[in-house]
Amino acid sequence: MATKLQDENTPCLAATPSEPRPTVLVFDSGVGGLSVYDEIRRLLPDLHYIYAFDNVAFPYGEKSETFIVERVVEIVTAVQQRYPLSLAVIACNTASTVSLPALREKFAFPVVGVVPAIKPAARLTANGVVGLLATRATVKRPYTHELIARFANECQIAMLGSAELVELAEAKLHGDSVSLEELRRILRPWLRMPEPPDTVVLGCTHFPLLRDELLQVLPEGTRLVDSGAAIARRTAWLLEHEAPDAKSTDANIAYCMAMTPGAEQLLPVLQRYGFETLEKLPV
């Protein structure tokens, strides 16, 4: 049986569409960006999608800003050298907060970032308590506090930074079950509040992958808000108004930075998302 798993020197085996389509790169340090890609694909199903994830340097939340900027620019450059891009989505909150200026300076195509959905959450809350669930890096960054001051200064913001949730989301996509008891332990600071958040911002693209489990643990009626739909709408607008005419007839493809057993285990998941082939990107 022919395998769809390939290294960088093997030609793509997947059937290719006949009509040229705009090429969109979705990038994350791990698989969390698939939640953003899924929203974009629902709105724009007929694009040529490339998903790239940095399984060598994952997770980014513990890396320095200088490292993240240099690494993201290097990876996007490597993809651009293989496929002329119409647009890139940096589907990682940590990378978005630090790398967008460098990317926009280097590349002519639009680059879309991800920011915590604090503004819509502040509008939705009924009790005035908004939870921000993110990585520790996102919780600490000045940009996050600027968003809160600008859009949610009348709300009580309960921030919870967790790297463990990122690992749980990755493990779920690898086929592991998610421990609700572990989730309760992570969310205990909120669950013990006299008035817990009624609206929770999923401030990491991994966290929508845990939506069902989070709703089982958080108080009944809690709203979960993320940026996926807004990013999809922004992508559609930019492709129509500002993106270069970079089109491809190739099939959707996923890139990892190292062909590890863990990356190989993701192939069935990537195929469910429409990526028939996984290759190692030479960087």
Curated annotation (Swiss-Prot):
The residues that hold substrate are 28-29, 60-61, 93-94, 205-206
In short, the EC number is 5.1.1.3
Q: A Gene Ontology MF term for this entry?
A: glutamate racemase activity
Q: In which pathway does it act?
A: Cell wall biogenesis; peptidoglycan biosynthesis
Catalysed transformations (reactions): L-glutamate = D-glutamate
Q: Which Pfam families match?
A: Asp_Glu_race
Active site positions, chain numbering: 92, 204
Protein purpose: Provides the (R)-glutamate required for cell wall biosynthesis.
**PANTHER family named in the record:** GLUTAMATE RACEMASE
- Protein name according to UniProt: Glutamate racemase
What is the species of this protein? Answer: Salmonella typhimurium (strain LT2 / SGSC1412 / ATCC 700720)
Gene this chain is encoded by: murI
